[in-house]
């Protein structure tokens, strides 16, 4: 069936901000869907609140709404745009839930909008646990013994049937939010109560435990003529009991017999037919009991998922793009496979002649007090994928691509320590983020494969692979550098050992290993991902390295520019940097360069095979990048766009003769190196907070007496404020040195005077050597001391005077010329008592670039990429700052609900995972939209609790009177109540937890509050008030930990976030009109 002609316009629902469990794989699927549908001539309308996405670029859809993904807001968009159909399968759980809401509230019927890609009934059947179980039984498939419960009473009834241990999951949530494994009554009670609260339908599914079973996934695509193909089978290295998003996974499945594979394949197809997924991609999960082979079906997702992004990258088969076309009526045999240049139709099942490994990336170090053991609730923040010719090579490449400091199977434990074995056994039994390394240590300590299997339930086949690598390491160590013959070295490289790992094992420099490889002429060749195991030739340059015989790279002799990506997502380095890399590639392609992308993150648009001319799916390490440069010989390499990952390589790449374009590595170092930067600042006569660099604790104490407290302390060279703290006295400072950092001459610690209550400002600018143009001035809403990545901000500034802004503009220009910036630069200032203090300068793409580009309509990353390639700003027509005639607010999304036990107080360490944007005619409206976009719904009135620190007591009176005007009744803790009483506002007095009951926590648990404002300073005060913030989070009460944000919230109460919707295209037309005027 060719495409449908009875629909002309289609609304695509996006996934919103990046949260744990739902990351940038949905930007990848959404961007593909937009492209695919417009290719077929449909008018595409998109809604997504996340500005850091490629899909929300104005050229991706006909009308783009960066608005909250809430049914009332989407109703406004439907009313205005009148789409014929809505496609909800591209935006994860957020989009599915929103589509079901639109259906439930009659919006789709009211405007005659058809749901395509999945029906409301199919979504409900797959998501509603009891319906799903019934459906599976009807086709003869077994599900785990389970039942649903809507109350604690029902939960205990189910428990009698399934017994301990049992797995508890709330319905309609994603990433396993609120779920867990209960081994006893107490845990059962706690997890069930939390789950009932978090499920939008207040329903739990309680399953028998399949812990230790093998877990598999099938990625299936079906069209309306009932053609079905399996795109890819995926095997979880980690057994059941660990969320698949937190498991190491391997494709294709390695340990299934052919018979088991066929059974599973047939079962998957039966599931899709039964659930009624007429078109598109779905993911079906199975569990197999290794003892007796019993197979059960765990769940299915009737949408594009994290696994389908992985399967697309693993096979080269673009699931989202194909799914979008199937949704409008095409069948698989009518669609061509792009990778083979149309030689094969999309109905050919991909075959692969390599092994793919995915390893999740965790950020537990950011969440002190979090439980870092892996369970059924997803906790990873990103992932890395690697391709190799065998399992060992694939695994090794993934380990070094993770960027956690591992060069391979590095040792975790000192085996001579008396408790070494105890530690290893604990880490194997209670899986944490580093279990894979402890497995290697177990073999080093003499444990057997069976011994490790009994503790981990990881299939013995995988364990044998790791054991063999450990044995090889021992042999190489024993043979020494002299024993590294051509044959031995080639064998090690074929098994994926990195030069860095070999150099560590042999105690020589990494460059020595590289020299030896040159001498023996041992270099990687590049193979193509072609969907067909080389049966047909492929024009698509999608490459991975291996130490095989034949190279398929076939480089051209065009002018090329290579862009280095950011590797796996992590907090502090996420989708914003990928956005910049994609823009660099797009801009330079338009200018006739051949672009080469190097990255290893399977979720992103940058690793899509048609984003760049050539894609190398490789770890972003020195060795891997140099090998690619050796084959491709690029004219220039861009390291400033992928965050800290490529930036760390800049100097070494330059030393190896690789041409870095844009700001030079030396200029980058001048901005990052404390002493060199200070010299530049002094030469320009700019103000900086007093600071010092120290290499020992006593020296720090001495300096602190000169500078004075509070101080910001942090190690030098970090991204996302890792290990950064504000200390308030000498005792606090000593504790920091003893607990938080290891300080030495190589790794000094920086001390800065902390400007309490200052307003922080972020400025993005571009310099081409002749002129500097400001991209945008963003005023932070949270005051200084909250990491810039965790602060909301407004463009244009909403309180700063023109005079102060001009002062900053002047300073940015001076700095850009002084540092010799070519391309993007980000500068941070703090404003206090009408003085401008320079905090830092980053001569690279910052995480604010996508937001500024959406707010002003100027594609900064593209403009700057062209500057790096030699074009001037004037020749591109970008010569003056754009100040839009409306307000844009960026607000962040924090993952505290995934980490019970962590204090949600904002501070200098970045912990947000994503962002949303709100736009309005006034600051109040923009802020209200941003708050709605990240899920904060502020009720009108109710009771507010105020408990603030000493430094905020002057301003709290003003805040209290604003809240009273808005209809709130007030409660306050003792110190705050006294101040308010003196000003004639009489709040109800409440007890702190140690002052007797009923205390604050009791009142929070009784749902007495609709809003809480709590600010704290100093180690002790923060510790004491932590229960209040945790309580607010647990009971879902809106709370603010800075006064500035509380004032902004009061302002936003005066605006209606759901009143009007405006597309990005309309906004940018307003900018254009105001520029022409």
Curated annotation (Swiss-Prot):
Record EC number: 6.3.4.16, 6.3.5.5
GO biological process: 'de novo' UMP biosynthetic process; glutamine metabolic process; L-arginine biosynthetic process
Keyword line: Amino-acid biosynthesis, Arginine biosynthesis, ATP-binding, Ligase, Magnesium, Manganese, Metal-binding, Nucleotide-binding, Pyrimidine biosynthesis, Repeat
Provenance organism: Vibrio parahaemolyticus serotype O3:K6 (strain RIMD 2210633)
Positions bound to Mn(2+) 4: 840, 842
Spans annotated as Oligomerization domain: 404-553
Protein name listed in UniProt: Carbamoyl phosphate synthase large chain
Segments forming domain MGS-like: 936-1077
Protein residues bound to Mn(2+) 2: 299, 301
Signal sequence interval, chain numbering: none
Cofactors: Mg(2+); Mn(2+)
Free-text comment on this protein's domains from its UniProt entry: The large subunit is composed of 2 ATP-grasp domains that are involved in binding the 2 ATP molecules needed for carbamoyl phosphate synthesis. The N-terminal ATP-grasp domain (referred to as the carboxyphosphate synthetic component) catalyzes the ATP-dependent phosphorylation of hydrogencarbonate to carboxyphosphate and the subsequent nucleophilic attack by ammonia to form a carbamate intermediate.
Binding site for Mg(2+) 4: 840, 842
Residue ranges of domain ATP-grasp in the record: 133-328, 678-869
Cofactor binding note of this UniProt entry: Binds 4 Mg(2+) or Mn(2+) ions per subunit.
GO molecular function, one term: carbamoyl-phosphate synthase (glutamine-hydrolyzing) activity
Record-listed Mg(2+) 3 binding positions: 828, 840
Function: Large subunit of the glutamine-dependent carbamoyl phosphate synthetase (CPSase). CPSase catalyzes the formation of carbamoyl phosphate from the ammonia moiety of glutamine, carbonate, and phosphate donated by ATP, constituting the first step of 2 biosynthetic pathways, one leading to arginine and/or urea and the other to pyrimidine nucleotides.
Gene Ontology cellular-component terms listed: cytoplasm
Catalytically driven reaction(s): hydrogencarbonate + L-glutamine + 2 ATP + H2O = carbamoyl phosphate + L-glutamate + 2 ADP + phosphate + 2 H(+)
Residue numbers binding ATP 1: 129, 169, 175-176, 208, 210, 215, 241-243, 285, 299
Binding site for Mg(2+) 2: 299, 301
Positions contributing to ATP 2 binding: 714, 753, 755, 760, 785-788, 828, 840
Binding-site positions, Mg(2+) 1: 285, 299
Pathway(s) this gene product operates in, as recorded in its UniProt entry: Amino-acid biosynthesis; L-arginine biosynthesis; carbamoyl phosphate from bicarbonate: step 1/1; Pyrimidine metabolism; UMP biosynthesis via de novo pathway; (S)-dihydroorotate from bicarbonate: step 1/3
UniProt region (Allosteric domain), positions on chain: 936-1077
């Amino acid at each position: 069936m060719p495409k449908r002609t009875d629909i002309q316009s289609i609304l695509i629902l996006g996934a919103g901000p990046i949260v744990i469990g739902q990351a940038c794989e949905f930007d990848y699927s959404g961007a593909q869907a937009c492209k695919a549908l417009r290719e077929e001539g449909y008018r595409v309308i998109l809604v997504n609140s996340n500005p850091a996405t490629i899909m929300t670029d104005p050229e991706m859809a006909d009308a783009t709404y960066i608005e909250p993904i809430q049914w009332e807001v989407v109703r406004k968009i439907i009313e205005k745009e009148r789409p014929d159909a809505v496609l909800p399968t591209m935006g994860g759980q957020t989009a599915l839930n929103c589509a079901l809401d639109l259906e439930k509230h009659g919006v789709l019927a009211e405007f005659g909008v058809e749901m395509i890609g999945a029906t409301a009934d199919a979504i409900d059947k797959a998501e509603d646990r009891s319906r799903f179980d019934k459906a599976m039984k009807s086709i003869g498939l077994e599900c785990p013994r389970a039942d649903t419960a809507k109350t604690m009473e029902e939960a205990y009834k189910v428990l009698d049937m399934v017994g301990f241990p049992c797995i508890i999951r709330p319905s309609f949530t994603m990433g396993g939010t609120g779920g867990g494994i209960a081994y006893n009554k107490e845990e059962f009670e706690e997890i069930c109560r939390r789950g009932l609260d978090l499920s939008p339908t207040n329903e739990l599914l309680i399953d028998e435990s399949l812990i230790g079973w093998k877990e598999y996934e099938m990625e299936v695509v079906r069209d309306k003529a009932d053609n079905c193909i399996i795109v890819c089978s995926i095997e979880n290295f980690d057994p059941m009991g660990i969320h698949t998003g937190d498991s190491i996974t391997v494709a294709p499945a390695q340990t299934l017999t052919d018979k088991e594979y066929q059974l599973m394949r047939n079962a998957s197809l039966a599931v899709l037919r039964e659930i009624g997924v007429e078109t598109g991609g779905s993911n079906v999960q199975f569990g197999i009991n290794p003892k007796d082979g019993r197979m059960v079906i765990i769940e299915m997702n009737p949408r594009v998922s994290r696994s389908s992004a992985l399967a697309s990258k693993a096979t080269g088969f673009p699931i989202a793009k194909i799914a979008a076309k199937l949704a409008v009526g095409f069948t698989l045999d009518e669609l061509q496979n792009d990778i083979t240049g149309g030689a094969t139709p999309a109905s050919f099942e991909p075959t692969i002649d390599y092994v793919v490994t995915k390893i999740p990336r965790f950020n537990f170090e950011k969440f002190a007090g979090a439980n870092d053991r892996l369970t059924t609730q997803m906790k990873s923040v990103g992932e890395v994928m690697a391709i190799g010719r065998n399992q060992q090579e694939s695994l090794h490449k993934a380990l070094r691509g993770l960027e956690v400091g591992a060069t391979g199977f590095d040792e975790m434990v000192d085996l001579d320590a008396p408790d070494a074995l105890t530690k290893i056994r604990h880490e194997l039994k209670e899986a944490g983020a580093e279990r894979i390394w402890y497995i290697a240590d177990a073999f080093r300590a003499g444990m057997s494969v069976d011994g490790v299997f009994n503790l981990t339930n990881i299939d013995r086949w995988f364990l044998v692979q790791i054991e063999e690598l450990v044995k090889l390491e021992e042999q190489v160590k024993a043979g020494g550098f002299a024993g590294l013959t051509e044959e031995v070295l080639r064998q090690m490289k074929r098994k994926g050992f990195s030069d860095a790992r070999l150099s560590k094992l042999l105690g020589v420099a990494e460059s020595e290993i590289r020299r030896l490889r040159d001498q023996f002429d041992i270099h990687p060749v590049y193979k193509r991902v072609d969907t067909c195991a080389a049966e047909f030739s492929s024009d698509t340059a999608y490459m991975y390295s291996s130490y095989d015989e034949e190279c398929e790279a076939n480089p051209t002799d065009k002018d090329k520019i290579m862009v280095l990506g950011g590797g796996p997502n992590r907090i502090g380095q996420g989708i914003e940097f990928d956005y910049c890399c994609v823009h660099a590639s797009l801009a330079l392609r338009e200018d006739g360069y051949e672009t080469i992308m190097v990255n290893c993150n399977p979720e992103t648009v940058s690793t899509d095979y048609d984003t760049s001319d050539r894609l190398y799916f490789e770890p972003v390490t020195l060795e891997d990048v140099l090998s690619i440069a050796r084959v491709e010989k690029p004219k220039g390499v861009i390291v400033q766009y992928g965050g800290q990952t490529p930036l760390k390589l800049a100097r070494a790449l330059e030393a190896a003769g690789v041409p870095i374009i844009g700001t030079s590595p030396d200029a980058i170092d001048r901005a990052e190196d404390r002493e060199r930067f200070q010299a530049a600042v002094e030469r320009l006569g700019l103000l900086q907070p007093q600071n010092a660099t120290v290499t020992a604790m006593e020296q720090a104490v001495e300096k602190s007496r000169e500078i004075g407290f509070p101080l910001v302390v942090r190690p030098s060279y970090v991204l996302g404020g890792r290990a950064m703290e504000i200390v308030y006295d000498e005792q606090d400072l000593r504790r920091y040195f003893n607990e938080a950092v290891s300080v030495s001459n190589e790794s000094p610690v920086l001390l800065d005077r902390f400007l309490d209550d200052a307003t922080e400002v972020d400025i993005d600018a571009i310099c081409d050597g002749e002129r500097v143009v400001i991209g945008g001035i963003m005023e932070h809403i949270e005051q200084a001391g909250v990491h810039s990545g965790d602060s909301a901000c407004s463009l244009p500034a909403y309180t700063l005077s023109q005079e102060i802004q001009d002062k900053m503009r002047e300073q940015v220009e001076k700095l850009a010329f002084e540092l010799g910036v070519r391309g993007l630069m980000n500068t941070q200032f703090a404003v206090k008592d009408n003085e401008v203090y320079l905090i830092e300068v980053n001569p690279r793409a910052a995480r604010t670039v996508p937001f500024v580009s959406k707010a002003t309509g100027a594609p900064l990353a593209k403009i700057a990429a062209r500057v790096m390639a030699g074009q001037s700003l004037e020749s591109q027509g970008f010569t003056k700052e754009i100040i839009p005639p409306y307000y844009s607010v960026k607000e962040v999304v924090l993952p505290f609900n995934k980490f019970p036990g962590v204090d949600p107080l904002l501070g200098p360490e970045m912990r947000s995972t994503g962002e949303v944007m709100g736009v309005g005619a006034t600051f109040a409206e923009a802020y209200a939209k941003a708050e709605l976009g990240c899920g904060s719904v502020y009720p009108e009135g109710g009771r507010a609790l105020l408990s603030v620190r000493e430094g905020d007591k002057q301003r709290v009176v003003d805040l209290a009177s604003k809240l009273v005007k808005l209809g709130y009744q007030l409660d306050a803790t003792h110190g705050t109540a006294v101040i308010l009483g003196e000003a004639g506002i009489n709040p109800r007095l409440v007890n702190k937890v140690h002052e007797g009951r009923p205390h604050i926590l009791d009142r929070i648990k009784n749902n007495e509050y609709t809003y809480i404002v709590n600010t704290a300073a100093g180690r002790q005060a923060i510790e004491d008030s932590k229960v209040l913030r945790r309580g607010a989070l647990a009971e879902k009460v809106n709370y603010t930990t800075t006064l500035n944000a509380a004032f902004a919230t009061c302002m936003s109460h005066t605006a209606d976030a759901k009143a009007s919707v405006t597309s990005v295209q309309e906004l940018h037309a307003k900018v254009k009109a105001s520029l022409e005027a």
